[in-house]
Amino acid sequence: MKSNNVVFARIFAVSWLVLFCEIMVVRWLGMEVRVLKAFPNLIVIIALVSTSAGLLVPSGKEGGNKRDLVQGLIAFLVLISSVLFSGPLHLADSSIKADHPAPEVALSAVALLMLSACLYVLFKILGKLLAAEFDKLKPIVAYSSNLLGSIAGALSFMIISELCVPPYIWLALVGAVLWFLYKKSYVIAVTVVCVAMSAFVYSGAYFTPYSKITVKPAPAEILAVNDQNSFALYSNNLYFNGGLNVDKVDHINEIQNDSVEVKGMKAYFGVLRVPIMFQPMHDDVLILGSGPGNDVAYALKGGAKHVDAVEIDPVIVKVGKEKHPNNPLTDPRTTVFTEDARSFLRYSKKLYDLVEFAYLDPGNTIDSASLVRVDNFVYTVESIKSVLNHLKPNGVATLIFTTPSVDSFIYQRLYKTVEAACGKPPIAYTARGGVTIVIMFGPGAHPASPDIMASADLVSYPPPGMVLNEPAMTDDWPFLYLALNPLGLITYALLLFVSVVVPVLLMVFSKADVKISKPDWGVMFFLGLGFMLMETKSITQLSLLYGATWLVSSVVILFVLVFAFMANMLASTRNFKSIGWIYLGLVLSLAFGYFWQMPTAGAEHPWLLAFVTSAIACLPVFFGSFIFSICFKNATSNIAYLSANLIGVAIGGLTENICMFSGIKSLAILALFIYGLAYVCWKIGQKNKPLVDVEKASVSS
């Protein structure tokens, strides 16, 4: 019989493993398997549902544990091999777009199903391992260990992400915890193989907090006419930028090569000089999304006295400082800020002659958009207004964006957003045959002269007769890339049915003795659903303050778990006969969060604003977790209650996508309704309990 301390430690370790692996596969698969960007929350939902399924099927015998371990290691090897060799397997460029060849779409669908199956096997085994230990402790103690392990998992990945640690370290940590749980030599063997493969495959890559960055020499044709130090940057296996000598960049137009890199450099560098052409008086320049420094080099070449370069990715800044032929980021006239563009605008007080929206999407999200819910708070009405507040009396702002088509819905959204922020139509052009849009606004913006239009190959936008039907983007609806592709919807629905709906139905209607009443199951389910909705809303609120970064998401997850742990500790101190007053606090905190408006400028002290915003965002989570802990304290079956809650969290991960249609603030209203259903289930359960107690008493007598 294991001591309580050993059981507590094992629950902690499994909980660490579940959350760490969940975050790890979300980030890693998103980098390597391109099509997964089109399916928001799919990995998280599969992980939660499979863990919940495992909780209801605890492994009893030691042989069963061995079989689980072998099956899990096989699934782990398949998953890791698919990720590491996504290039040769053509998973890196997979797509489910209707205009792609049918074999490619079929391959993508098969790959998604295979990866989903591997994830299901892995997380179900972790759920079984957790179930084997969970019922050995009192509910409140077991849940405390679960929360502490989850907190440690979130904190661990947050730290290694910020330190730009490569994946072989991730795998080594996972292998070490698995060995602690199983004490089997083949766990070490499989870990060593996976670590070695990862170290070999990623030997030349940088893992930033946001993406995988690879630096290669520019194509030979570029090197021949530009500079021998010119380079190409790849983000998540796709070319997205490069560093060229801007004094010789005109020569690349003579190259006939149609490679992705050459075409991309022609389109990108062809419009870089446009902002300077539109604002000849540009002593002070701000560049949002400065990348490796090309925009900065053009601004300095054009006579800028000082340039503030804002770039969120520290690795891209490092590459620019070390490798760019013009050395713009190390020029004494340049100040580099490694932070989110929206966060910089909030706290900066400086005014500029020229503000440039440069490359702000190094992940090439738009190239894989199908059913995409990507929050982008830089291209919103509120953000554009913030830029206007940073312009001098004759200042100009330019927004340059590249998409595959002149009639792209993205062009329309960007145009309508700037129009809504300025109160009048902006000056807009398309360039390079329609693949790039240039939007100018601000008090000093004026239409281009015919000479400038001819020199930069500009055409007025929108074309005559074109109707712009797309909505403007706001902080409540910041979905620049959202495109409801019918094929993507069908594929997503099929994946959800196979990976989520079927397992949930099997769990709900199984005849296993789960020792939980229907009202209690409903309480746990709806509390989990509401929890996920409020976690999503919290991430969004804090993204407006600090930027939509991995660090923000990790910090929110960490704080949510800490709040849940605090609520759990409070629930363990005494017996609460009624939770009505806690529901009242939950309702009030939801209402306050809905009506509270974050200040648009950084007049308040950053730490004070951070504390207030975090408290308002996470307070509903505290009350919801408090209710959960009180109910869980009296659970008749730890694993049954936790399983129901995880199913609710998983379905919440799907339900949160309603905000694509109704806005992010609507999640608070939806959460209020969901928590109301939890309260109704609790009241029904309270009415039924006296009847159950009477029946038990009569049987015993």
Regions found by a protein language model. Name each.
Residues 1-701:
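Alpha-helical transmembrane segments of multi-pass membrane proteins
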